[in-house]
């Protein structure tokens, strides 16, 4: 059965992949980001590493043919973005250029192989050489990857972007490097949807994982809440008070068009997409009590899956779509429960603490992150779906809320007031490596991580 989407959906943009021998003139005629690939292999298996060991990558060249101060800024931006992406990958480590036995900026196109022997004794497995150039109003990022030990070129890609699209090109390069060397799909091109009061009202925004390229998605000067990505990354479901009632909307991020999909009397909140995108779980109070329902993304086929006088909110699906975790106060305090997707076999999951909310099921299926109140502060915990393995992920000052998993299940985005204003942070699944993404004085809330 096909997913039922609104009939008004916009035409989806495409990223084209063509051969390295494709016409350069044809490439220049297109406005989107393009990629030429010279390598026929999908994954390179020549780099071996022990489990947990990172691949060391030297970065050389990044010579710049874009003249003037703008060119210098672009060069620095490309390196900064690449470094952030490789750090996020947790499998590739960029070697400090100052530690190399030669000036990395002097490596010129066509002469890269000459420098490989000088890296062999430095525990460096791969070398990335890159060059930025400009053709009319387009930027071209030419990147080559070399196996240091085998002394051979293993990848050659070119990326074209408009003058404001360099970071998107670098994110694409980063994902290609990660996939080519490890066989694992990268997350560098994913985004976070979130709520912020940057404009004075709480609106929906998007941003890259390095905190850059912030884009405002709603402009209704009202209260907008809980953006949730569709599994294909095409839509955002969110709650808005733009018409006075908490109604549920669907936003096509490819063109900005929105439609109201649930506006029943009372609450229309807590949207959660099924993994296949065919259903949406949500909380409604149309009958007085707040219960969980399923409906199609176009607002049709409404089905009630909980029935009680208690509150049922905040659903999250298991990655196989068979179960739903949610919050209910049916035991007297807000706790996490799990049930089958049709509403049967309900069981309580959390027993420690009197306030446990905001469950988020890992894409790997092995953990559920949630928020628990401990000694007056809100912290993020993780627990197995069977109720075991409880682990505190955040500690110290501040209120830590709204966990959202990365699509590979290795990171969690969340909001925290640890530095005063509410900001967006990410951390590894075990709670390590916590870092702030938002950088201004506005408040940031309820991040939701896009699919790949």
Model feature map: region roles:
Residues 20-33:
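Bacterial N-terminal signal peptides
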Residues 149, 208-212, 252-256, 296-300, ...:
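Short loop/turn segments that connect beta-strands within beta-propeller blades
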Residues 185, 196-203, 219-222, 239-247, ...:
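A flexible loop/linker signature enriched in serine peptidases of the S9 family
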Residues 186-188, 231-232, 275-276, 319-320, ...:
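Residue-level detector of Asp-centered blade-edge/turn motifs that repeat once per structural unit
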Residues 192, 233-236, 277-281, 321-325, ...:
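Hydrophobic beta-strand positions that form the internal "hydrophobic ladder"
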